[in-house]
């Protein structure tokens, strides 16, 4: 495991956890300034890799990271929504599922944090949109399917007729009827999600209050009449304000003859009702999250519009087919027919319409092509949504691993924190920078400076000792009596086999101890017995060749002046490399008589003095015998 460490940032943040090569590595916990935000989990060379980030507002991210950004699979949770899926460059993408607490859900493709490509959006009331998206909005071709009217959510915004997360509520009862003269909003005001078709002859509330000149100089739908309408109420479609209008007033702007309209007060017409089980489907083009372009909207009761759209309204050339089979076609403006009219007789209409009919036919043909394209995009969107659901499942699995990594990181941080804060007791580090367990004291078997016993063995002198300092075996090599003090080294019984331990050299060691007990360590050789010197565990010897000159102990002449006999001394011929217990191989070599040297004061050998005294006594005895 990587060694632990702690790093305090200048802004008040702090990191506690694994540390390697001067960077966060392994498990660790990092907090922001003032504990605002926290990441806990795995780190890789200074960057987050797998873990959990918790923001100051309570939102969290669990998943993969790369180069300090969210990358791979992960789950983001906020107070009102959750995203599960892929991440790219710190943003949502490429595939994932977004869900809101209200029930809204999007499954599909993402780009730069927004819905982009193909996807399926399911609304809180159960309605759906399947098709193309761009920069988080419905854009391209798609299909919007509503739920039954009594289940559809009531829209708040007067501009939104397609439900989304920011402008949706669970289905609620219809709003109270407006007061007479109350200005109606757009066609979507008070409408249900997914329902945009207007009833027969309905016109936009705002535009219907404009004065329109008619034949005979009368003002249909004047402001005065708008304020005094007795039947001022919203139509059952919920998209426009109902009014008292005659059959003729529904054909405002038509190409019919001037005398075809009544000049008296308008006759109220019963509003059309929408069944609670009615549904509505739109298939076609979308622009900036609204129905715009060519498309077809059809209600389950038979009401149908084919043609051009703009901002969720019928705008341009198109055709409306009513449930009873009758049709009206022409040019629409903000849901209001301004050129054209009802189709009563095909022959008179064909003579009057001219170019309007041609434009309507082109618009209807374009709307039908748009429906075909929208259905194809719908299938692609469904496939992308299925892939996104699989990515969401994989992201949830990664999130579980991230939570486990965060738990491990917090445990390690808790273990490291007391040790890092304790004064005077920090973890040891080896030469490579890795931490080791702190030791209260060194083990007695550990040698100083990192030397092993074989490396720390003292070397024998490379030259003979001078007369002022006679050579003697090093103390660490001399055999000691049983129970003796071995100094900084352990007993020979604990040495391993390669050092000549007791397993192989027990007999030789016993021989040394026996000689020590018998007092063999005399000051010099006696009766030609070899002198055992220090032995080295190296492969060399003190002398490799015979006949090499070597200084010996000073010799004294007898009073008669005769030269002394050659002295036989042992010379080391070879050394065993098995260890300090191994014996030395010796060979007796005859050495030439040493040259005379003046006796050094204080350097006489007691044996020599005794021999001289014995010689004097012998000479005295001989002289006494001769005299007698």
UniProtKB/Swiss-Prot annotation:
* Membrane topology summary: Peripheral membrane protein; Single-pass type IV membrane protein
UniProt feature, compositional bias: Pro residues: 170-179
Identify the main location: membrane
Q: Which is a Gene Ontology cellular component entry for this protein?
A: smooth endoplasmic reticulum
* Classification via InterPro entries: Junctophilin, MORN
Q: Where is the composition biased (Low complexity)?
A: 231-241, 453-467, 528-541
Question: Tell me, which GO biological process terms does this entry list?
Answer: learning; neuromuscular process controlling balance; regulation of cytokine production; regulation of store-operated calcium entry; regulation of synaptic plasticity
Q: Does the keyword Cell membrane apply?
A: yes
Q: What happens when the gene is disrupted?
A: Jph3 and Jph4 double null mutants exhibit atypical depolarizing responses, irregular cerebellar plasticity due to abolished crosstalk in Purkinje cells. There is hyperphosphorylation of PRKCG and mild impairment of synaptic maturation. Exploratory activity, hippocampal plasticity and memory are impaired and there is abnormal foot-clasping reflex.
Tissue and organ distribution: Specifically expressed in brain. Highest levels in the olfactory tubercle, caudate putamen, nucleus accumbens, hippocampal formation, piriform cortex and cerebellar cortex. Expressed in disctete neurons sites. In hippocampal formation, expressed in dendrites of hippocampal pyramidal and denate granule cells. In cerebellum, it is highly expressed in Purkinje cells, while it is weakly expressed in granular cells.
Q: Which UniProt keywords apply?
A: Cell membrane, Endoplasmic reticulum, Membrane, Repeat, Transmembrane, Transmembrane helix
Transmembrane annotation, as ranges: 607-628
Localisation per UniProt entry:
Cell membrane; Endoplasmic reticulum membrane
Annotated stretches, region: Disordered: 158-214, 231-276, 418-603
Q: Does the keyword Ion transport apply?
A: no
Source organism, top-level taxon: Eukaryota
MORN repeat spans: 15-37, 39-60, 61-82, 83-105, 106-128, 129-151, 282-304, 305-327
Query: Topological domain, Cytoplasmic: which ranges?
Result: 1-606
Q: Any domain commentary?
A: The MORN (membrane occupation and recognition nexus) repeats contribute to the plasma membrane binding, possibly by interacting with phospholipids.
> What functional role does this protein have?
Junctophilins contribute to the formation of junctional membrane complexes (JMCs) which link the plasma membrane with the endoplasmic or sarcoplasmic reticulum in excitable cells. Provides a structural foundation for functional cross-talk between the cell surface and intracellular calcium release channels. JPH4 is brain-specific and appears to have an active role in certain neurons involved in motor coordination and memory.
The family assignment reads: Belongs to the junctophilin family.
- This protein is called Junctophilin-4
Which gene holds the coding sequence for this protein?
Answer: Jph4
């Amino acid at each position: 495991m990587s060694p632990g460490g702690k790093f305090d940032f200048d802004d008040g943040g702090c990191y506690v956890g694994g540390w390697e090569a001067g960077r966060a590595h392994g498990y660790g916990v990092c907090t922001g300034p003032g504990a605002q935000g926290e990441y806990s989990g795995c780190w890789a060379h200074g960057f987050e890799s797998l873990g959990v980030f918790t923001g100051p507002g309570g939102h969290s991210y669990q998943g993969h990271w790369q180069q300090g950004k969210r990358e791979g699979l992960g789950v983001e949770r906020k107070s009102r929504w959750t995203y599960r899926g892929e991440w790219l460059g710190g943003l949502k993408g490429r595939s994932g599922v977004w869900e809101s607490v209200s029930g809204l859900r999007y499954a599909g493709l993402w780009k730069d944090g927004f819905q982009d490509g193909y996807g399926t959006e399911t609304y809180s009331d159960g309605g759906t949109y399947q098709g193309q998206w761009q920069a988080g909005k419905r854009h391209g071709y798609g299909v919007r399917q509503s739920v039954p009217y009594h289940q559809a959510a009531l829209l708040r915004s007067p501009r939104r007729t397609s439900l989304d997360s920011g402008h949706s509520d669970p289905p609620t009862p219809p709003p109270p009827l407006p007061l007479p003269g109350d200005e109606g909003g757009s066609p979507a005001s008070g409408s249900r999600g997914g329902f945009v078709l207007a009833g027969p002859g309905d016109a936009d509330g705002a535009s219907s209050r404009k004065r329109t000149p008619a034949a005979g100089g009368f003002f249909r739908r004047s402001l005065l009449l708008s304020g005094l309408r007795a039947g001022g109420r919203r139509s059952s479609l919920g998209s426009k304000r109902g009014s008292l209008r005659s059959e003729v007033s529904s054909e405002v702007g038509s190409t019919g003859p001037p005398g075809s309209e009544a000049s008296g007060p308008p006759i109220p017409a019963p509003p059309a009702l929408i069944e609670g089980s009615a549904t509505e489907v739109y298939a076609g083009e979308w622009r900036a999250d609204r129905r715009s372009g060519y498309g077809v909207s059809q209600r389950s009761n038979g009401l149908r519009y084919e043609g051009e759209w703009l901002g969720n309204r019928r705008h341009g050339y198109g055709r409306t087919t009513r449930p009873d089979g009758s049709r009206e076609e022409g040019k629409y403006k903000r849901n209001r027919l301004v050129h054209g009219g009802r189709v009563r007789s095909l022959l008179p209409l064909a003579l009057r319409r001219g170019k309007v009919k041609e434009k309507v036919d082109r618009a209807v043909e374009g709307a039908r092509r748009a429906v075909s394209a929208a259905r194809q995009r719908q299938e692609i969107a469904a496939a992308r949504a299925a892939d996104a659901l699989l990515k969401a499942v994989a992201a949830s699995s990664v999130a579980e691993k991230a939570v486990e990594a965060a738990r491990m990181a917090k445990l390690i941080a808790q273990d490291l924190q007391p040790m890092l804060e304790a004064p005077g007791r920090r973890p040891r580090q080896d030469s490579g920078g890795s931490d080791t367990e702190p030791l209260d004291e060194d083990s007695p078997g550990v040698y100083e400076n990192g030397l092993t016993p074989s490396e720390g063995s003292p070397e024998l002198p490379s030259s003979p000792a001078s007369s002022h300092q006679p050579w003697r075996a090093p103390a660490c090599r001399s055999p000691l009596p049983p129970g003796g003090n071995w100094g900084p080294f352990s007993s020979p019984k604990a040495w391993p086999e390669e050092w000549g331990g007791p397993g192989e050299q027990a007999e030789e060691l016993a021989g040394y101890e026996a000689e020590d007990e018998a007092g063999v360590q005399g000051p010099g050789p006696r009766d030609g017995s070899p002198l055992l010197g220090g032995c080295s565990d190296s492969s060399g010897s003190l002398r490799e060749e015979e006949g090499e000159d070597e200084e010996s102990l000073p010799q004294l002449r007898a009073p008669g002046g005769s030269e002394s006999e050659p002295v036989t001394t042992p010379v080391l011929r070879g050394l065993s490399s098995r260890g300090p217990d191994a014996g030395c191989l010796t060979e007796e070599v005859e050495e030439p008589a040493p040259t005379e040297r003046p006796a050094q004061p204080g350097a006489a050998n007691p044996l020599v003095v005794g021999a001289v005294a014995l010689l004097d006594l012998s000479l005295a005895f001989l002289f006494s015998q001769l005299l007698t």
